[in-house]
Amino acid sequence: MSPELYNIFYESHRGSWAILIILFLVSYFLIKAGKGKAGKILHMIVRLFFVIMLITGAGMLVYWQFAFLFIVKGVLAIVLIYAMEMLLTRTSKGTIGQQARIYWIVFITCLVLVALIGYNVISF
């Protein structure tokens, strides 16, 4: 893979994460406020960004030849995506209950770890 292609994946990945987190939070609070239709539209856009994250992340994983640290980051990112999806889906259905606290803890923990690994603060 050429460095130019890697740069495209990297910039798309990094910028899309910021947009994804903002859209996720807006969608969540719209759903909590009872504005279901607007929340559902944003939820669909969030799902599109999930796909973008997975494709660009896989491209970068290939570039780095499946280094262990980036495999760990990928697994954490998938858990993060799962937590975001469960928070949005179960909140909109009204079935989140006591599990909301657990999903928020998983969301925040994975988000911090993925960001720290992504910006090379954590490395091994």
From Swiss-Prot:
Record flagged with keyword Membrane: yes
GO cellular component, one term: plasma membrane
Keyword terms: Cell membrane, Membrane, Transmembrane, Transmembrane helix
Subcellular location: Cell membrane
Main localization, broad class: membrane
TM spans (from-to): 15-35, 40-60, 61-81, 102-122
InterPro entries tied to this protein: UPF0344 (IPR010899)
Domain of life of the source: Bacteria
Topology of this chain in the membrane: Multi-pass membrane protein
Family (UniProt): Belongs to the UPF0344 family.
UniProt-recorded name of the protein: UPF0344 protein BH2983
Organism per entry: Halalkalibacterium halodurans (strain ATCC BAA-125 / DSM 18197 / FERM 7344 / JCM 9153 / C-125) (Bacillus halodurans)
Lineage, opening ranks: Bacteria, Bacillati, Bacillota, Bacilli, Bacillales
